[in-house]
């Protein structure tokens, strides 16, 4: 059977809570930043639930020896935030995965063509074999930025099966493109909205995540 794009919208009350705060146009920049970070934290918990390799062990409690299980941190982990909005997710996701290496990719959308232009690429020429990669892209509108980043990862030996994407808001146009180009991909998003406007912004969305994170256009 051919692989099919998997997208999960976790039914967690704290995800809905922080999403509501992030959507509210009255939310000030510091609180918006907190909301995005918290969404990153809870989405990361969900994304790695059955994804991280573990190793069995035994520990001695104050009373007896008992079986235990630990994350196998010898397996390479990477976090790839897509700048600039992806920066809002980095710190909280890194707290969930403290051993992960971070590789920044900076993309700016052309306001006419809506296509991404790369101004920063800190990915190595080749990632470690069997790396697990979390890509942070808060707004999946047209999908151009994520597709560009996935192409960069593919060229460095990373398959879609090795990647999980964290997004705050996703829209059908992006998901359709991703399902065609990378059907084996897995995405975790706080919500899927209905449409894009004529400027390529998600509606209802939450506005420009980068502008609201940093208080600057």
From Swiss-Prot:
Protein's UniProt keywords contain RNA-binding: no
Chemical reaction(s) catalysed: UMP + diphosphate = 5-phospho-alpha-D-ribose 1-diphosphate + uracil
Pathway linked to the protein: Pyrimidine metabolism; UMP biosynthesis via salvage pathway; UMP from uracil: step 1/1
Binding-site list for 5-phospho-alpha-D-ribose 1-diphosphate: 84, 109, 137-145, 208
Regulation: Allosterically activated by GTP.
InterPro entries: PRibTrfase_dom (IPR000836), PRTase-like (IPR029057), Upp_B (IPR034332), UPRTase/APRTase (IPR050054), Ura_phspho_trans (IPR005765)
Cofactor details (free text): Binds 1 Mg(2+) ion per subunit. The magnesium is bound as Mg-PRPP.
Cofactor(s) it depends on: Mg(2+)
Similarity section: Belongs to the UPRTase family.
Name the record gives this protein: Uracil phosphoribosyltransferase
Organism: Synechococcus elongatus (strain ATCC 33912 / PCC 7942 / FACHB-805) (Anacystis nidulans R2)
Gene this protein is translated from: upp
């Amino acid at each position: 059977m051919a692989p099919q794009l998997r997208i999960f919208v976790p039914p967690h009350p704290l995800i809905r809570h922080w999403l509501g705060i992030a959507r509210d146009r009255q939310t000030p920049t510091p609180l918006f930043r907190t909301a995005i970070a918290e969404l990153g934290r809870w989405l990361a918990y969900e994304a790695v639930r059955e994804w991280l390799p573990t190793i069995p062990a035994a520990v001695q409690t104050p009373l007896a020896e008992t079986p235990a299980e630990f994350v196998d941190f010898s397996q390479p982990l990477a976090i790839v935030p897509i700048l600039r909005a992806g920066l809002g997710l980095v710190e909280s996701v890194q707290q969930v995965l403290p051993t992960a290496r971070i590789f920044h990719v900076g993309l700016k959308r052309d306001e006419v063509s809506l296509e991404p232009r790369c101004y920063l690429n800190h990915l190595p020429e080749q990632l470690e074999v069997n790396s697990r990669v979390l890509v942070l892209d808060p707004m999946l509108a047209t999908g151009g930025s994520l597709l560009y980043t996935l192409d960069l990862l593919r060229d460095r030996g990373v398959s879609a099966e090795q990647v999980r994407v964290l997004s705050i808001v996703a829209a059908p146009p992006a998901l359709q493109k991703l399902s065609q180009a990378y059907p084996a991909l897995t995405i975790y998003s706080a919500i899927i909205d209905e449409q894009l406007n004529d400027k390529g912004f998600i509606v209802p969305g939450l506005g420009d995540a980068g502008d609201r994170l940093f208080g600057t256009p």
